[in-house]
Amino acid sequence: MTKIELRALGNTGLKVSAVGFGASPLGSVFGPVAEDDAVATVREAFRLGINFFDTSPYYGGTLSEKMLGKGLKALQVPRSDYIVATKCGRYKEGFDFSAERVRKSIDESLERLQLDYVDILHCHDIEFGSLDQIVSETIPALQKLKQEGKTRFIGITGLPLDIFTYVLDRVPPGTVDVILSYCHYGVNDSTLLDLLPYLKSKGVGVISASPLAMGLLTEQGPPEWHPASPELKSASKAAVAHCKSKGKKITKLALQYSLANKEISSVLVGMSSVSQVEENVAAVTELESLGMDQETLSEVEAILEPVKNLTWPSGIHQN
């Protein structure tokens, strides 16, 4: 059995699986997931070589953390065998990036996850807060938690790419260890590429999420609330239909496209069933043994060309 490739994450010394386990679906965000299924999914992912699990108290109003905690506990392996990231600042009730809330947040998360520490604690979707508060209050609070051993490393997440440079230019080097970007490294949008040299120069590890663009590049299509423009939605639909007509799965192609760039340490994919885990792992191992289906990829890229790198607004206006 091919083990999934492990990649170095910035300067952290962590080695994360090229595919990471996105645990938001365990919070029944996209439909109900039974506890037994959640536990079985985590177990299968770990068995097949996925060692990196990502969650947040926001996903499913804390349910994702609880389910992931149960799944990890059931593995009955040493804590150092897996890497866990959770987040703070975004909750079902809204956003709160204050030092006080962050302190409370990690204690609550650790209890739900049944862990003594997390490997990475991210500020979640910082474009919805004041970036200056993130720099002057939130990140220093996270540094304190790092000193106390509640998290090993600190990260920031969000959609607009300029939030990363804004914060990283204003905090001491080595303060932020990791960034998590989503929807900016996939077949339809690869704008994260432009930022990679900058992030490398800062010694910051890069995690990319949503290679399927939050459902745009799937046969079932995006959820009703998806913020993409009608143009982007219809081009994506055409790309999906093209793959289907050739008997190919766009999800596999899209995931492989994201995985092919080794500068990105891990690509997070949401998983809520054993079959999804197996499908994702097969995509990785096939990429390593057979390479990409270049012909279909070129055809899909041609269909998406008119909407390439189109994104959508996210966050509040920063003055």
Curated annotation (Swiss-Prot):
Residue numbers binding substrate: 124
Observed phenotype of the null mutant: Lower leaf ascorbate concentration with accumulation of L-galactose when grown under high light conditions.
Top enzyme class: oxidoreductase
CDD domains named in the record: AKR_galDH
Classification via InterPro entries: AKR, LGALDH-like, NADP_OxRdtase_dom, NADP_OxRdtase_dom_sf
Record's keyword annotation contains Lipid biosynthesis: no
GO molecular function: L-galactose dehydrogenase activity
Active site residues per record: 59
Biological role stated in the UniProt entry: Catalyzes the oxidation of L-galactose to L-galactono-1,4-lactone in the presence of NAD(+). Uses NAD(+) as a hydrogen acceptor much more efficiently than NADP(+).
Keyword annotations of the record: Carbohydrate metabolism, Galactose metabolism, NAD, Oxidoreductase
pH dependence, record text: Optimum pH is 8.5-9.
Family: Belongs to the aldo/keto reductase family.
Catalytic activity of the protein: L-galactose + NAD(+) = L-galactono-1,4-lactone + NADH + H(+)
EC numbers, comma separated: 1.1.1.316
Domain SIS: 122-269
Cellular component annotations (GO), alphabetically ordered: cytosol
SUPFAM superfamilies in the cross-refs: NAD(P)-linked oxidoreductase (SSF51430)
Region forming the signal peptide: none
Gene3D superfamilies: NADP-dependent oxidoreductase domain
Protein name: L-galactose dehydrogenase
